[in-house]
């Protein structure tokens, strides 16, 4: 499957991230059953990553690249675009499909 992007609320429709830019996002990560495992919103601190530097899972690289600034979307990411057969011990089980609620706040 890879990554599926479902818009929750639209962005500006013009400003999309490019490789090398820093994406500033708020997110909540959940397992398919809705169990939350991480959230920048709970910490009240946006998360930053550089697109194209493999600092995040492949599903984020490809999913966030399709979002415009201000957009909030649900990213449904298959395990091969996330943590695969290994998972993340104690947090994400092996072969888990992940669901992220991501808002692209700005680009730097």
Curated annotation (Swiss-Prot):
It comes from the Eukaryota. It is found in: Cytoplasm, Cytosol; Sarcoplasmic reticulum membrane. It catalyses: [protein]-peptidylproline (omega=180) = [protein]-peptidylproline (omega=0). The modification N6-acetyllysine is found at residue 53. One of its GO terms (biological process) is ventricular cardiac muscle tissue morphogenesis. Inhibited by both FK506 and rapamycin. It holds the Pfam family FKBP_C. InterPro entries: FKBP-type_PPIase, PPIase_dom_sf, PPIase_FKBP_dom. It is a peripheral membrane protein. Its main location: cytoplasm. The modification N6-succinyllysine is found at residue 53. GO terms for molecular function: FK506 binding; identical protein binding; peptidyl-prolyl cis-trans isomerase activity; transmembrane transporter binding. Its EC number is 5.2.1.8. The keyword Membrane applies. Residues 20-108 form the PPIase FKBP-type domain. Gene3D superfamilies: 3.10.50.40. Belongs to the FKBP-type PPIase family. FKBP1 subfamily. Interacts with TGFBR1; prevents TGFBR1 phosphorylation by TGFBR2 and stabilizes it in the inactive conformation. Interacts with ACVR1B and SMAD7. Identified in a complex composed of RYR1, PDE4D, PKA, FKBP1A and protein phosphatase 1 (PP1). Interacts directly with RYR2 and RYR3. Interacts directly with RYR1. Interacts with GLMN; rapamycin and FK506 abolish the interaction with GLMN in a dose dependent manner. Keeps in an inactive conformation TGFBR1, the TGF-beta type I serine/threonine kinase receptor, preventing TGF-beta receptor activation in absence of ligand. Recruits SMAD7 to ACVR1B which prevents the association of SMAD2 and SMAD3 with the activin receptor complex, thereby blocking the activin signal. May modulate the RYR1 calcium channel activity. PPIases accelerate the folding of proteins. It catalyzes the cis-trans isomerization of proline imidic peptide bonds in oligopeptides. This is Peptidyl-prolyl cis-trans isomerase FKBP1A. The lineage of its organism: Eukaryota, Metazoa, Chordata, Craniata, Vertebrata.
